[in-house]
Amino acid sequence: MSDEPLSSSEESPSVSVLHPKVLLLSAGFTGAAAASYFLYGRYVRRVKTYLDLTPAILDGQRKLYGKVTRVGDGDNFRFFHTPGGVLLGWGWLRKIPDTRSGLKDQTLMVRLCGVDAPERSHFGKPAQPFSEEALQWLQSYVGGRSVTITPYSIDQYKRVVARAQVWRWTGKRDVSAEMLRNGLGVVYEANSGAEFGENEGWYRRLEEKAKRRRRGMWSLGSKLVTPGNFKRQ
């Protein structure tokens, strides 16, 4: 056997980084990484507080799935985001905190879009009629339940103004619409900060129907003071 070294023509060929196969493989890895990052951000990453809400989420096209942990007033509640729901283990592998300390800095305060409920007693002012009924209704309707929210904006109190939908035995229901239907709120009156998505006309028709039927707060007739006017008094 000859001990002479291999000639240059007999050496193993090297593969250039510009070889089409190398470029194709690199593009595949880059694309997979980009897709993974996108899917994680859109479907897996938890939105813990309003600070996690990006412009891409606040465009009215993204929905967040989670659980209502506390109802604070007639038109707002605390929301714990559970991306992926039971498919990603929420409720059986991943526990939702149930204590105030466990939920600290882990929830969104959601303000229902398009609706204003009667004001409860605070800042030395008495409660409006039907404020307690509105609170109890919202607690029974969404309290402890899984809901889907569509965020629109963040208000001056760092609340997420959003559409909320919940599954009931009659199907998926719009929470703001159901409050208006039952006369437990009015269409939001402020000149700024109002959010309706694409439902303003629908909400106004529901309010008018409840008014004609004297449902809830509309049973007060001429004595009714809307929440907006009450806050300005």
Curated annotation (Swiss-Prot):
Q: Pfam families in the record, alphabetically?
A: SNase
Which InterPro entries does UniProt cross-reference here?
A: SNase_OB-fold_sf (IPR035437), Staphylococal_nuclease_OB-fold (IPR016071)
The record lists the organism as Clavispora lusitaniae (strain ATCC 42720)
Q: What gene, per UniProt, encodes this protein?
A: LCL3
Q: Which residues bind Ca(2+)?
A: 116
Q: Where in the cell is it found?
A: Mitochondrion; Membrane
Against SUPFAM superfamilies, the record matches this protein to: Staphylococcal nuclease
Citing just one GO molecular function, the answer is: endonuclease activity
What is this protein identified as?
Probable endonuclease LCL3
Task: Enumerate the spans annotated as TNase-like domain.
Answer: 62-220
